[in-house]
C-alpha cells in the first residue's frame, strides 16, 4: 500500500437506542447512533415490536377513524 493515500481506519462505537454499544472500525465519522440493532430488532429477537416514528401510526389511525364511523 502506498503511504498517505488511504483514509484512516479507526475504531468507532455504534450506539443503539436500546442501550447496546457495538465496537467496530470505520473510515467514516466518529461515533454513530442507530435506532435498531441486532440486539433489539424483531427479526433477530423473535419478538413482535411496533416501531412508531414520530407518532405516524397515531396520526394515521386518527385520520382514518373518521371514515369507519
From Swiss-Prot:
List GO molecular-function terms, semicolon-separated: metal ion binding; rRNA binding; structural constituent of ribosome
State how the cofactor is bound.
Binds 1 zinc ion per subunit.
What UniProt keywords are attached to this protein's entry?
Metal-binding, Ribonucleoprotein, Ribosomal protein, RNA-binding, rRNA-binding, Zinc
Instruction: Tell me the superkingdom of the source.
Output: Bacteria
Read off the InterPro entries from this record.
Ribosomal_bL28/bL31-like_sf (IPR034704), Ribosomal_bL31 (IPR002150), Ribosomal_bL31_A (IPR027491), Ribosomal_bL31_sf (IPR042105)
Indicate which residues the UniProt annotation says bind Zn(2+). 16, 18, 37, 40
Coiled coil: which residue ranges? none
Q: Name one GO cellular component term.
A: ribonucleoprotein complex
Record-linked PROSITE patterns? RIBOSOMAL_L31 (PS01143)
The cofactor required is: Zn(2+)
Q: Name one GO biological process term.
A: translation
- Supply the Pfam families for this chain: Ribosomal_L31 (PF01197)
Q: What cystine pairs are annotated?
A: none
Q: What does this protein do?
A: Binds the 23S rRNA.
Under PANTHER family, the record lists: 50S RIBOSOMAL PROTEIN L31, CHLOROPLASTIC, LARGE RIBOSOMAL SUBUNIT PROTEIN BL31A
Q: Which NCBIfam families match?
A: L31, PRK00019.1, PRK00528.1
Under the subunit heading, UniProt states: Part of the 50S ribosomal subunit.
Concerning its family, UniProt says:
Belongs to the bacterial ribosomal protein bL31 family. Type A subfamily.
Stated name of the protein:
Large ribosomal subunit protein bL31
Which organism encodes this protein? Syntrophotalea carbinolica (strain DSM 2380 / NBRC 103641 / GraBd1) (Pelobacter carbinolicus)
- Organism placement in taxonomy: Bacteria, Pseudomonadati, Thermodesulfobacteriota, Desulfuromonadia, Desulfuromonadales
Point out the gene that encodes the protein: rpmE
Amino acid at each position: 500500500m502506498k503511504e498517505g493515500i488511504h483514509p484512516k481506519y479507526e475504531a468507532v462505537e455504534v450506539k443503539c437506542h436500546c442501550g447496546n454499544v457495538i465496537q467496530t472500525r470505520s473510515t467514516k465519522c466518529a461515533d454513530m447512533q442507530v435506532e435498531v440493532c441486532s440486539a433489539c430488532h424483531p427479526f433477530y429477537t423473535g419478538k413482535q415490536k411496533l416501531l412508531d416514528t414520530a407518532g405516524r401510526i397515531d396520526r394515521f389511525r386518527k385520520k382514518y377513524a373518521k371514515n369507519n364511523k
